[in-house]
UniProtKB/Swiss-Prot annotation:
Biological source species: Rattus norvegicus
Name assigned to this protein: Pro-adrenomedullin
Alphabetical GO biological process terms: adenylate cyclase-activating G protein-coupled receptor signaling pathway; adrenomedullin receptor signaling pathway; androgen metabolic process; animal organ regeneration; branching involved in labyrinthine layer morphogenesis; cell population proliferation; cellular response to xenobiotic stimulus; developmental growth
Residue ranges of coiled coil: none
Disordered, as annotated region: 68-89, 125-185
Length: 185
């Protein structure tokens, strides 16, 4: 029994130590790759800045240089010429992206993302809402105040006359008279 528990402890510690050392190896490999990339990037920028002392590229020289690089690539079969030309093109792209400045505006926090999402939902749900009623409801056969306003004068006169005849023909209680006054308004 003691032998099994000791073996389990050894296997557990071996697994933990093995996992820790594996993490260190990947991070050190990443650091090596990162440093190598940064050094090559610095060398390319240094070469580009020495070729353009002012740091600005003249617009007239750019097309001729790119044409010259393409001609060199097509005529020479050496791999060294192609890597130099691609490195030179990369530097130009990098320089152009630096001149453009930051492309995205706003923040990238989770709360900002939620606010943008809520705003988009509001726009999508509120876009179709109008302050006006549909066309078929605005017609004289429609509903509400629009219907009463759009009735022709002849029909209004008839409704007023018919309501007056009803009040004159039969005496109504004071409550009915108040209701009829309110409905006339």
């Amino acid at each position: 029994m003691k032998l099994v528990s000791i073996a389990l402890m050894l296997l557990g510690s071996l697994a933990v130590l093995g996992a820790d050392t594996a993490r260190l190896d990947t991070s050190s490999q990443f650091r090596k790759k990162w440093n190598k990339w940064a050094l090559s990037r610095g060398k390319r920028e240094l070469q580009a800045s020495s070729s353009y002392p002012t740091g600005l590229v003249d617009e007239k020289t750019v097309p001729t240089q790119t044409l010259g690089l393409q001609d060199k690539q097509s005529t020479s079969s050496t791999p060294q010429a192609s890597t130099q030309s691609t490195a030179h093109i990369r530097v130009k792209r990098y320089r152009q992206s630096m001149n453009q400045g930051s492309r995205s505006t706003g923040c990238r926090f989770g709360t900002c993302t939620m606010q943008k999402l809520a705003h988009q939902i509001y726009q999508f749900t509120d876009k179709d809402k109008d302050g006006m009623a549909p066309r078929n409801k605005i017609s004289p056969q429609g509903y509400g105040r629009r219907r009463r306003r759009s009735l022709p004068e002849v029909l209004r006169a008839r409704t007023v006359e018919s309501s007056q005849e009803q009040t004159h023909s039969a005496p109504a209680s004071p409550a009915h008279q108040d209701i009829s006054r309110v409905s006339r308004l």
